[in-house]
C-alpha cells in the first residue's frame, strides 16, 4: 500500500533530519586523547621506578596510557646536550603537558613558555630562575623540588660514621650536570667544617671512570661520595665495582647503587617525587593551571645500607644508624 505524505509533514521531517545530522556527526567524532611529553636526560632502564610512580599517580586520577591519555617518552640516554632537541620536538607537536625530569627544567623553560610544564628540580628552582616563587610559580611551570644539593653534607656525615679516619673525601660527579657546581660548593663547605679535604673528579663519559678512581687513589682518598646524576645510573655497576676494587667506603645518592652492591645510599625518594609530578599532570589535564599549583618541596629521603658490602670492606655500621635505615640489604 502506498503511503501518502503531505508537503508540510515532509518538510518537517526533512528539517528534523537536517538538524539532527550535525548533532549525530559531532557525537560520533572521537574525543582527542591528550598527549603528555616526558623528557629526561637519563634512560628508560635507569628511571623505571620513577616512571612507574608517575604512571601510578595518573592511574589514581583516572588516566591510563594508551587509553585516555598518551605518554611520549624522550630519553637523552645520558647526553644532556640532546635535551633541548627532544624538548623542541615535543613543542612542535603541541603536546598537552611536558614533564621535564632529571634537571631539564631550565632547558624546558627556554624551549617554550606556553605549554604547561611540570618539572623536578634537585636545587632551588627560584635560584635557578625556573619560577619566581615556590608558592606562586606563575606562568606555565610548576613541579617538585627536592633540593638534592643540601643532601651532600648529610651524605658526608653518614660516610664518616663508618669511615671516621678518612681525611680526604672523594667526590665523583658528571661535569655536564646542571647542578654539579652547586653540589661541589655544598660539599666543600661541609668538608672544610669537618676538617676534611674534598677531592673532586669530573666524569664526562664511561671511559673516564677508571682513570678517575686511579686519580682518587693516588690522592689518598679514604672515602667517596658519588653524585646522584641521572647518567650515573647507567654506569652504576662499574662505579660500584671500582669502589670495591679500591676498597673505598662510598655513599651514593640513589637506592639503585646500594642494590647493585654499593655500601650505602642516601638521597631523595625520587619515586615519591615523580608520583607528585603525576598528580600535578593529572590536575592540569583536568583544567587547572600550573600558575595556581605551588611547587612541592619534597622532604622524603631514603637511606639504604648494604651489610654484605660493609662486611667485605671490614666496616661496621653503628646500631643507631642501622635503626634509621629505610632498607637494609643482607
PLM ranges: what are they?
Residues 1-330:
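Short hydrophobic alpha-helices and adjacent helix-cap/hinge residues
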Amino acid at each position: 500500500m502506498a503511503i501518502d505524505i503531505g508537503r508540510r509533514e515532509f518538510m518537517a521531517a526533512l528539517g528534523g533530519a537536517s538538524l539532527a545530522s550535525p548533532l549525530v556527526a559531532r557525537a560520533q567524532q572521537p574525543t582527542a586523547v591528550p598527549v603528555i611529553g616526558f623528557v629526561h636526560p637519563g634512560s628508560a632502564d635507569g628511571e623505571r621506578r620513577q616512571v612507574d610512580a608517575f604512571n601510578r599517580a595518573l592511574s589514581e586520577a583516572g588516566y591510563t596510557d594508551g587509553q585516555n591519555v598518551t605518554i611520549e617518552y624522550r630519553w637523552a640516554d645520558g647526553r644532556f646536550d640532546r635535551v633541548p632537541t627532544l624538548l623542541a620536538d615535543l613543542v612542535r607537536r603541541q603536546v598537552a603537558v611536558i614533564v621535564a625530569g632529571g634537571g631539564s627544567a631550565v632547558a624546558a623553560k627556554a624551549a617554550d613558555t606556553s605549554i604547561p610544564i611540570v618539572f623536578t628540580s634537585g636545587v632551588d628552582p627560584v635560584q635557578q630562575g625556573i619560577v619566581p616563587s615556590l608558592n606562586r610559580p606563575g606562568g606555565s611551570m610548576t613541579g617538585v623540588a627536592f633540593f638534592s644539593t643540601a643532601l651532600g653534607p648529610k651524605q658526608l656525615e653518614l660516610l664518616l660514621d663508618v669511615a671516621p679516619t678518612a681525611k680526604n673525601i672523594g667526590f665523583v660527579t658528571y661535569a655536564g650536570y646542571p647542578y654539579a657546581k652547586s653540589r661541589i660548593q655544598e660539599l666543600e663547605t661541609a668538608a672544610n667544617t669537618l676538617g676534611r679535604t674534598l677531592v673532586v673528579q669530573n666524569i664526562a663519559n664511561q671511559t673516564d671512570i677508571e682513570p678517575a678512581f686511579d686519580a682518587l687513589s693516588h690522592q689518598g682518598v679514604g672515602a667517596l661520595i658519588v653524585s646522584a646524576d641521572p647518567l650515573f645510573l647507567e654506569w652504576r655497576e662499574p662505579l660500584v665495582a671500582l669502589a670495591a676494587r679500591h676498597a673505598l667506603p662510598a655513599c651514593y645518592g640513589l637506592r639503585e647503587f646500594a642494590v647493585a652492591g654499593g655500601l650505602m645510599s642516601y638521597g631523595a625518594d625520587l619515586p615519591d617525587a615523580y608520583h607528585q609530578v603525576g598528580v600535578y599532570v593529572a590536575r592540569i589535564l583536568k583544567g587547572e593551571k600550573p600558575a595556581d599549583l605551588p611547587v612541592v618541596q619534597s622532604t622524603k629521603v631514603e637511606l639504604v645500607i648494604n651489610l654484605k658490602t660493609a662486611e667485605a670492606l671490614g666496616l661496621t655500621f653503628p646500631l643507631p644508624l642501622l635503626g634509621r635505615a629505610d632498607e637494609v640489604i643482607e
